[in-house]
Amino acid sequence: MEDTFLFTSESVNEGHPDKLCDQISDAVLDACLEQDPDSKVACETCTKTNMVMVFGEITTKGNIDYEKIVRDTCRDIGFTSEDVGLDADHCKVLVNIEQQSPDIAQGVHGHFTKRPEEIGAGDQGHMFGYATDETPELMPLSHVLATKLGARLTEVRKNGTCPWLRPDGKTQVTVEYRNDHGAMIPVRVHTVLISTQHDETVTNDEIAADLKEHVIKPVIPEQYLDEKTIFHLNPSGRFVIGGPHGDAGLTGRKIIIDTYGGWGAHGGGAFSGKDPTKVDRSGAYVARQAAKSIVASELARRCIVQVSYAIGVPEPLSVFVDTYGTGKIPDKEILKIVKENFDFRPGLITINLGLKRGGYRYLKTAAYGHFGRDDPDFTWEVVKPLELEKPAA
């Protein structure tokens, strides 16, 4: 028997209270950037029964209707009555937004006087980017499957295939892997877990049958399922009360779901509600582009990149690369290639990845993952052709 191991990733869908908060924070960011691309945004959201509050620091020339953004976002997700967990049109909306601290503003941007390469990081911190050749997206399979199951739950709820579904839900996938000299080879799906909110009318048997037919079958490739695959479908029994009525929600509570499903590493900084001067977001995006480009160019089968910053300082303090023993050339050579091909200064990341553009851009990232998505707005997913040093003749 070959040596294998199990690894698990989870996801939540857009009606989960924490994810609702992420989406509201990013909808606010989108609105600010659309009206004023130089907006400085640090927008947090929290929610509980019948209440949503947005709070934080925002400096923008835009005229932002925060309450409308909150209600529209909740409504689009499907929170249209107290039965489903929140009533977008009648819930309490509290707004407590202040301007960015002038101390931070002068240290970071003096943004009207400084050239882009002089803009300092908005805070200290360290961020990671990760890539692996186990899927076409160059993302971990356990994470990809958990995420796609969550997205599919929402799809069949909104298109009427499973009318008994309600917005809140969670998924989790355990994959059996083989380690091939540092590269990850998925062998099979060991366990699939789905807990979804539903209305009172549906039976547990109907839930299980519909989830297998309309959610699991279309998402998980047949080659990974066998007679030993375990399914836990709403294992707690009933899940009628959900959304903010079931649990309180908070922006930035789902950072592993947003990234790599427990693979790679995480510096701890959340993404949603933050403009691109916040390196928690822009640093993690460029680190993903670097790691993905290394794997896509077949310099390694698996790669992690770390970058770190000091507040007010444009140049990163450190850049680190590890290819888990899968590199075609030594890691120190790959590190050199990364440093020569990617500019980690926040002002330049923002320009190179076009991060000042709002619209529906960031709202899309706030559910179903920031990485491995096939969408032109996810500019950090574009593989950069790497210029390699030609050895001297």
From Swiss-Prot:
This protein's name: S-adenosylmethionine synthase
Protein's organism: Musa acuminata
Subcellular location: Cytoplasm
Role: Catalyzes the formation of S-adenosylmethionine from methionine and ATP. The reaction comprises two steps that are both catalyzed by the same enzyme: formation of S-adenosylmethionine (AdoMet) and triphosphate, and subsequent hydrolysis of the triphosphate.
Cofactor binding notes: Binds 2 divalent ions per subunit. The metal ions interact primarily with the substrate. Can utilize magnesium, manganese or cobalt (in vitro). Binds 1 potassium ion per subunit. The potassium ion interacts primarily with the substrate.
Family: Belongs to the AdoMet synthase family.
Catalytic reaction equation(s): L-methionine + ATP + H2O = S-adenosyl-L-methionine + phosphate + diphosphate
Pfam families: S-AdoMet_synt_C, S-AdoMet_synt_M, S-AdoMet_synt_N
Keyword Transmembrane helix: no
